[in-house]
């Protein structure tokens, strides 16, 4: 019997060939060419204090007399450790300076924060607030006329975060963009583009109005509070740093963000015909005031809500076992960059001083001031590590960062040049010979000299006596390296039985 289900089926020719992907350069993990020793050191900073005005800086004769110290700003610490290659070790077997170099490996960190918990208030005396859009009582459609700015204050979005790496952290924000040769009419909305930049000390965090360049995109200077109205709010570019090839900018991070919208307002300003509400989305009204539509430019005031010590990321120790990137905590060039954002201690100090000898109260008799203070303390546990000076390791490190080899006083051989060169006599003073050559610019030894960081020098604050410091004692206990001073063994007491004949017998 013929099986109809086994008939031959014709298929068209498949002329598609799938080739294997192109090989990529393999990025090595630091565990593959860095050897760790059993030597650990503790490093701690002094008490780091900061005092200033919470909303803006105050200048006199074009000189800043009182800096801006906002609780909503990033603090970026550039921590420098001592060069371990200059240490004098008693044990000569620790490393061979002819074939090895020493580096630090981060094992523990604690970021201490002083001052009580508090909510910082920010605002603007002329904030663009047209009307209440949450519970309106009147239909306001005069958004294109007059001046409706009000004195408004609120608390910002609550943020706790810190980020650790051996290179500066990257941030992202939105700003205006213009194509070459494009004509932009006055009043038109510009193009916007994302900008990636280094997060510097003093850069503003996102407080609930987005990561953007407010100086370029909000020319009315009244849409956001004073501390960000002419600033750029940046947000850490976690995606970019997570995909970084060498993993130097972000060993690990911790963050906690929370926000809700407290009030809903409308903005003043002309919406324009280009972005008017399409008539297909509503039915027209027959009578005023609804024949003219109100503005659709809505905004909500952020609020970070309650702060609590139960959800604090700071004042606790963190132990580094495995980083998310290829750099497993190696502090290249003996430095770390600690990016901190924390506005849970944002209380502003209100200071009032008498300006005359009057003994009665009047607003005119006192001068009021605002100050904000911040307190930090940084502690680290670092491990001594070795790198063998093999050609493969040196070539790989030179590709990653040539400055590392320069710090190690190693140079890469240059290709041979022409041994015969021209040397003119009186070249600098003679008008007959050719023009003297320009002196080559001095090589830049610090690639981050154009950025602003809080410098923390720990070159003389390192110790191998871990038990003398709080973080060191925690590390000894967590790692099981604590030396026990007393044995826990106990001696069993002998039981004695006294018979009626007063003879002592040892219990069997």
Swiss-Prot record:
Q: Superkingdom of the source? A: Viruses
> Assembly and partners?
Self-assembles into homopentamers. The capsid has an icosahedral symmetry and consists of 72 capsomers, with each capsomer being a pentamer of L1. Interacts with the minor capsid protein L2; this interaction is necessary for viral genome encapsidation. Interacts with protein E2; this interaction enhances E2-dependent replication and transcription activation.
UniProt feature, compositional bias: Basic residues: 491-508
Q: Name one GO molecular function term.
A: structural molecule activity
Q: Keyword Lipid metabolism: yes or no? A: no
Can you name this protein? Major capsid protein L1
UniProt keyword annotations, A-Z: Capsid protein, Disulfide bond, Host nucleus, Host-virus interaction, Late protein, T=7 icosahedral capsid protein, Viral attachment to host cell, Viral penetration into host cytoplasm, Virion, Virus endocytosis by host, Virus entry into host cell
Specify where the region named Disordered lies, as residue ranges: 480-508
The UniProt entry's sequence similarity note says: Belongs to the papillomaviridae L1 protein family.
User: Which Gene3D superfamilies does its entry note?
Assistant: Major capsid L1 (late) superfamily, Papillomavirus (2.60.175.20)
Q: What role is this protein assigned? A: Forms an icosahedral capsid with a T=7 symmetry and a 50 nm diameter. The capsid is composed of 72 pentamers linked to each other by disulfide bonds and associated with L2 proteins. Binds to heparan sulfate proteoglycans on cell surface of basal layer keratinocytes to provide initial virion attachment. This binding mediates a conformational change in the virus capsid that facilitates efficient infection. The virion enters the host cell via endocytosis. During virus trafficking, L1 protein dissociates from the viral DNA and the genomic DNA is released to the host nucleus.
């Amino acid at each position: 019997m013929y099986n109809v289900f086994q008939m031959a089926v014709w298929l068209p020719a498949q002329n598609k060939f799938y080739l294997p992907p192109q090989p990529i350069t393999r990025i090595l993990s630091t565990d593959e060419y860095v050897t760790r020793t059993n030597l650990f050191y503790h490093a701690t900073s002094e008490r780091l204090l900061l005092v200033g005005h919470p909303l803006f800086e105050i200048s006199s004769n074009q000189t800043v007399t009182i800096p801006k110290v906002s609780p909503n700003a990033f603090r970026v610490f550039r921590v420098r450790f001592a060069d371990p290659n200059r240490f004098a070790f008693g044990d000569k077997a620790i490393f061979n300076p002819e074939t090895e170099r020493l580096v630090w490996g981060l094992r523990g960190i604690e970021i201490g924060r002083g001052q009580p918990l508090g909510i910082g208030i920010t605002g603007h005396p002329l904030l663009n607030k047209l009307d209440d859009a949450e519970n309106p009582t009147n239909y306001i459609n005069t958004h294109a006329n007059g001046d409706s700015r009000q004195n408004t204050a609120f608390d910002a979005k609550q943020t706790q975060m810190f980020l650790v790496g051996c290179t500066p952290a990257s941030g992202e924000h939105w700003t205006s963009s213009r194509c070459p040769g494009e004509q932009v009419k006055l009043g038109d909305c510009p193009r916007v583009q994302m900008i990636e930049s280094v997060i510097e000390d003093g850069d503003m965090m996102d407080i609930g109005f987005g990561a953007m360049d407010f100086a370029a995109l909000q020319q009315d200077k009244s849409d956001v509070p004073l501390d960000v109205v002419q600033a750029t709010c940046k947000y850490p570019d976690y995606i970019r740093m997570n995909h970084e090839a060498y993993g130097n900018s972000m060993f690990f991070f911790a963050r906690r963000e929370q926000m809700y919208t407290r009030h809903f307002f409308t903005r003043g300003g002309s919406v324009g015909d280009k972005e008017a509400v399409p008539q297909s989305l509503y039915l027209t009204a027959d009578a005023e005031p609804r024949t003219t539509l109100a503005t659709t430019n809505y905004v909500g005031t952020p609020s970070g809500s309650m702060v609590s010590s139960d959800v604090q990321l700071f004042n606790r120790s963190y132990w580094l076992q495995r980083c998310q990137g290829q750099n497993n905590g190696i502090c290249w060039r003996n430095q770390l960059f600690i990016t901190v954002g924390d506005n849970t201690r944002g209380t502003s100090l209100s200071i009032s001083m008498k300006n005359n000898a009057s003994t009665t109260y009047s607003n005119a008799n006192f001068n009021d001031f605002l100050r904000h203070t911040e307190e930090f303390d940084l502690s680290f546990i670092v491990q001594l590590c070795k790198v063998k000076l093999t050609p493969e390791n040196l070539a790989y490190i030179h590709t990653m960062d040539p400055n590392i080899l320069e710090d190690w006083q190693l140079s890469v051989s240059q290709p041979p040049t022409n041994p015969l060169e021209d040397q003119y006599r009186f070249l600098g003073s003679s008008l007959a010979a050719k023009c003297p050559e320009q002196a080559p610019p001095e090589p830049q030894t610090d690639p981050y000299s154009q950025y602003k960081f809080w410098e923390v020098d720990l070159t003389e604050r390192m110790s191998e006596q871990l038990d003398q410091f709080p973080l060191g004692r925690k590390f000894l206990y967590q790692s099981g390296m604590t030396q026990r001073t007393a044995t826990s063994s106990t001696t069993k007491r002998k039981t004695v039985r006294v018979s009626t004949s007063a003879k002592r017998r040892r219990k069997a």
